[in-house]
């Protein structure tokens, strides 16, 4: 999370800046499992197809969120090998800063996140798990939970606590993800579960906390967090 106001007021503005080049400045990764474009024809009993995991500030923007999101969706962050843990494979969206420094300039707040592919993915999903990073002074060593999908949010809290991970439902309006315009709340049920994880808490998930090596050095703490998130999504 940047210290000051965003450089760009929207993703449209970010993409319009010729200084930003896909594959150099930023990257986009997403996966959508097969479903009908017609909402009424989408299956209602397949939690995998119905759920999307997002890291809208991935890569170097809010470091570590890409890796968490991929693993929570069921794909190993280093190899993209699908999980066989029995908790399914989910759709995902990642927008990743690729700069060696200054990735905070690519942060567009969730309520101004008018990315067309991401919007389509969310609007055609029933549930959303959204991963964010915040400052240590905001999190105080405790994962901050929010979003308008209170059922999933509360299940995430329960599973995190069962895994021995400190978490709480935040009352900070900068972190609570409760704006209806938050892209992650634009699901078919009008809500998401949002996690805000402090800088140091994200750093502790990896043996080597650099963009090239995070995916290769995930540790027990990382997989404990991911396991709790995957169990949570299987319960809704």
Regions found by a protein language model. Name each.
Residues 1-236:
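N-terminal catalytic or cofactor-binding beta/alpha core of small enzyme domains
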């Amino acid at each position: 999370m940047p210290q000051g106001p965003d450089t760009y007021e929207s993703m449209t503005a970010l993409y319009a800046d010729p200084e930003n080049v896909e594959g150099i400045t930023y990257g986009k990764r997403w996966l959508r499992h097969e479903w009908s474009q017609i909402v009424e024809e989408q299956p209602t009993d397949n939690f995998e197809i119905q759920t999307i995991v997002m890291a809208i500030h991935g890569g170097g923007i809010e470091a570590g969120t890409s890796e968490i999101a991929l693993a929570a969706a069921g794909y190993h962050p280093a190899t993209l090998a699908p999980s066989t843990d029995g908790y399914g494979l989910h759709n995902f969206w990642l927008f990743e800063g690729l700069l060696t420094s200054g990735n905070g300039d690519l942060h567009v707040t969730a309520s101004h996140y008018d990315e067309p592919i991401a919007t389509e993915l969310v609007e055609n999903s029933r549930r959303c798990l959204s991963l964010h990073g915040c400052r240590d002074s905001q999190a105080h060593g405790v994962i901050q939970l929010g979003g308008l999908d209170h059922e999933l949010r509360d299940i995430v809290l329960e599973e995190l606590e069962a895994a021995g991970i400190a978490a709480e439902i935040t009352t900070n309006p900068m972190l609570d993800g409760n704006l209806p315009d938050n892209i992650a709340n634009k699901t078919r049920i009008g809500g998401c579960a949002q996690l805000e994880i402090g800088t140091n808490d994200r750093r502790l998930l990896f043996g080597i906390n650099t963009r090239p090596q995070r995916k290769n050095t995930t540790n027990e703490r990382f997989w404990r967090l991911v396991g709790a998130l995957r169990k949570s999504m299987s319960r809704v």
